[in-house]
Structures are given as structure tokens and as C-alpha cells.
Curated annotation (Swiss-Prot):
Lineage: Bacteria, Bacillati, Actinomycetota, Actinomycetes, Mycobacteriales
Domain of life, per lineage: Bacteria
Annotated protein name in UniProt: Uncharacterized protein Mb0028
BP terms from Gene Ontology: protein secretion
Pfam family for this entry, one: T7SS_ESX_EspC
Length: 105
């Protein structure tokens, strides 16, 4: 017995929109780094190690957010593509079924 696959392209597009919004938000997070960087820059020479380490961590954090944003954007694109492919498949299957029915008359 085979299981029936039920896909709702609208749900795929809704999920894609959510992932795209998440990606867009994640891309904005590093903009808050300027305030942190200014705070680090204000530290005196005694805290130079802390300042340098903080800058490195901010760069790593920026890269992490960028990677997460890229991943969410990729998921969004894949979901949109899947929805379009599913609709194309449904149209083709419907035409094929219509041809079978029309051909039997």
C-alpha cells in the first residue's frame, strides 16, 4: 500500500516567506555591532587583549549570522522552487489524465 503525498504549495510559499523574513532579520543583527565595537574601542591600553578578543568575537558573530541568513535564504528559495515544481507536476498529471479520458471516447 502506498501512502498518498498531499502537498499544499501555498503552505510551502508561506514557509518560504517566513524563512526569507528570518534571513532578512539575521542580516540586520550585525548592525548592532557598531555600538559594541565603540565600547570596546573606548577601553584603555590595559584592556587591549580584551578589546582584540572582543573584536575577533564580533567578527565571528557577524560571520555566524551571515551563514544563518544564507541558510534561511536557501531554504526559502528551495521551498518556492518546490511549490512551483509541485504545481507544474499537478498540471502535467491533470493534462495526462485528461488525455486518457479524452482518448477513450
Amino acid at each position: 500500500m502506498t501512502d498518498r503525498i498531499h502537498v499544499q504549495p501555498a503552505h510551502l510559499r508561506q514557509a518560504a516567506a517566513h524563512h526569507q523574513q528570518t534571513a532578512d532579520y539575521l542580516r540586520t543583527v550585525p548592525s548592532s555591532h557598531d555600538a559594541i565595537r565603540e565600547s570596546l574601542d573606548s577601553l584603555g591600553p590595559i584592556f587591549s587583549e580584551l578589546r582584540d578578543t572582543g573584536r575577533e568575537l564580533l567578527e565571528l558573530r557577524k560571520q555566524c549570522y551571515q551563514q544563518q541568513a544564507d541558510n534561511h535564504a536557501d531554504i526559502a528559495q528551495n521551498l518556492r522552487t518546490s511549490a512551483a515544481m509541485w504545481e507544474q507536476h499537478e498540471r502535467a498529471a491533470s493534462r495526462s489524465l485528461g488525455n486518457i479520458i479524452d482518448g477513450s471516447r
